A protein has these predicted regions:
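Active-site activation/catalytic loop segments of kinase-like enzymes and analogous catalytic loops
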Residues: 4, 11-51, 60-77
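A short glycine-rich, hydrophobically flanked beta-strand micro-motif that places a catalytic Asp/Glu
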Residues: 54
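Basic, amphipathic N-terminal segments
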Residues: 86-177
């Protein structure tokens, strides 16, 4: 199979790059009509060999499995963020000094991790409103809001779930091609 010499998929078969583009640009949503339209458009510029066309279903499977792997890695990162939030919540509840609580919150970089922020804030709002207010004040210093970060965390979950669902449907579709 012809191999790419440049780009992010250099050294890989050209048909894998096509499959990865199809999978990535459509959030894992691939059906027969998409494949045919994409292939027709691609071949109007650069013809593919018969071997490449025959290998397309396998390469689509590989690209979709890679996309699903990335979603699983994101899910593990979210799980780690939730575990960090639980640990921090327990630590914050044990400590009563405001300065030490602030230091713990500062180390967490809540504004950079919406899942961690959402989880920790939710736990603190339930158990210690003072810490929840402290978290909100720290976020405001960074020009961020708890509502905005919680919305971002929810959007990330929805998109990840949708992408995983798309990949599974696409794998089934390709299996039937």
């Amino acid at each position: 199979l012809p191999v790419l010499l440049h780009g992010s998929h250099a050294g890989l078969p050209r048909i894998y790059d096509i499959a990865a583009c199809m999978a990535g640009r459509r959030d894992g949503r691939i059906d027969e009509a998409t494949v045919y339209a994409f292939m027709e458009a691609y071949q109007s510029v650069t013809p593919l060999t018969m071997a490449e066309v025959a290998e397309l279903p396998n390469m689509l499977n590989a690209a979709l499995v890679k996309l699903l792997t990335l979603e699983c890695e994101r899910a593990l990162e979210a799980e780690n963020s939730m575990e960090t939030a639980k640990s921090a919540a327990a630590q914050l509840e044990r400590i009563k000094e405001r300065a030490r609580r602030e230091a713990i919150i500062d180390r967490l970089s809540l504004g950079e991790d919406p899942v961690l922020c959402e989880c920790l804030y939710g736990m603190m709002k339930e158990h210690d409103e003072g810490i929840a207010e402290l978290i909100n004040a720290k976020l405001q210093l960074e020009d961020k809001s708890i509502d905005g970060l919680c919305a971002k965390a929810a959007a990330m979950r929805r998109r990840s779930t949708q992408r995983a669902d798309n990949v599974i449907r696409s794998l089934r579709c390709i299996g039937g091609m």
